[in-house]
Amino acid sequence: MSAMKALLEEIAKALVDSPDDVQVTEVEGEQTTVLELRVRTEDLGKVIGRQGRTARAIRTLLSAAGMKVHKRFVLEILE
């Protein structure tokens, strides 16, 4: 498991009511890695946040951490 995947999983589990249902899938490309986050429908609002602020903050963390390894990380939140 990559460090970014583990980071996203820990953040998401801390936010939701059903941490056992959090799934993170990693799709790696040459320069970009897509992290797909799946949570229960009831927890979707907690991960996205009001006006997308929580999702934006998570994306910012992934972007900052990705600079260290010279890779771009994209977060997709799925049901």
Predicted regions and their residues:
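RNA-contacting regions in translation and RNA-metabolism proteins
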Residues: M1-K46, R56-E79
